[in-house]
């Protein structure tokens, strides 16, 4: 008797719940067809975004792992130690200080000529100065750019037509010397310019990148 009574009460509760749902009086979490359709669309969009993020992560993990600090041997996760060491190498790579002998030779060469030497002459100067300490062709190029910028800052602000023509000639020669080698080293001064470069040099680099 007790069992039948409980079953009867349960069936009665179910009937009342169905009746409330039909009348819209049930306050439970029931979604309409429109809400279900919106939810399906949101789930589909989320799945597409997840797939794109996975592809992006895989592509970044496989692109230059040593320079980006990512270590594929550890599952492709970001390695902060590797990233910090890589950034340290980049920041200290261009901190070159000439020796006293190198500086004397560079000053004498600068006094003999005018402006920045061409690519071949820079290579010869770097070879000569390498006997007195560590130096690269990029160091030589940047030194002449810095030296030329310092000289211009010391000159009066008035410029003649001849001076402007000389600047155009030097800029043309710099572009030609940069394009001779075709290697990355030729463009290191563009990617990592020295902080002492003058505004004229930065403007000439911008014009070179546009052409």
Swiss-Prot record:
SUPFAM superfamilies: Homeodomain-like. The keyword Amino-acid biosynthesis does not apply. Its main location: nucleus. CDD domains: homeodomain (cd00086). Expressed in root vasculature, pericycle and stamen. Expressed in the procambium during stem maturation. Residues 147-183 are annotated as: Disordered. Disruption phenotype: Retarded growth of the primary root, and partial sterility with aborted and short siliques. Late flowering under long-day conditions. The double mutants wox4 and wox14 exhibit reductions in vascular cell division. It is found in: Nucleus. Coiled coil: none annotated. Disulfide bonds: none annotated. Keywords: Developmental protein, DNA-binding, Homeobox, Nucleus, Transcription, Transcription regulation. Acts redundantly with WOX4 downstream of the TDR/PXY receptor kinase to regulate procambial cell proliferation and differentiation in vascular tissue, independently of any role in vascular. Involved in the regulation of gibberellin (GA) biosynthesis pathway. Positively regulates the expression of the GA biosynthesis gene GA3OX1, and negatively regulates the expression of GA2OX1 during secondary growth, which increases bioactive GA content in the inflorescence stem. Promotes vascular cell differentiation in the inflorescence stem. Transcription factor which may be involved in developmental processes. This is WUSCHEL-related homeobox 14. The gene is WOX14.
């Amino acid at each position: 008797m007790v069992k039948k009574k409980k079953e009867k009460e349960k069936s009665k509760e179910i009937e009342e719940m169905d009746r409330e749902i039909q009348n819209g009086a049930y306050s439970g979490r029931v979604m309409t067809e429109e809400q279900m359709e919106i939810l399906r669309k949101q789930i589909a969009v989320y799945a597409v975004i997840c797939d794109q993020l996975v592809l992006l992560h895989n592509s970044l993990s496989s692109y230059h792992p040593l320079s980006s600090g990512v270590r594929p041997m550890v599952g492709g996760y970001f390695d902060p130690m590797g990233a910090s060491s890589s950034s340290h190498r980049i920041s200290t790579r261009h901190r070159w200080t000439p020796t006293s002998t190198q500086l004397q030779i560079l000053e004498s060469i600068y006094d003999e000529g005018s402006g920045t030497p061409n690519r071949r002459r820079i290579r010869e100067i770097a070879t000569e100065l390498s006997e007195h300490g560590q130096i690269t062709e990029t160091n030589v190029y940047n030194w002449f750019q810095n030296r030329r910028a310092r000289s211009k800052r010391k000159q009066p602000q008035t410029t003649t037509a001849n001076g402007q023509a000389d600047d155009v000639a030097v800029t043309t020669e710099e572009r030609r010397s940069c394009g001779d080698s075709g290697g990355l080293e030729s463009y290191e001064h563009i990617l990592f310019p020295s902080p002492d470069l003058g505004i004229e040099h930065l403007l000439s680099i911008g014009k070179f990148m546009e052409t």
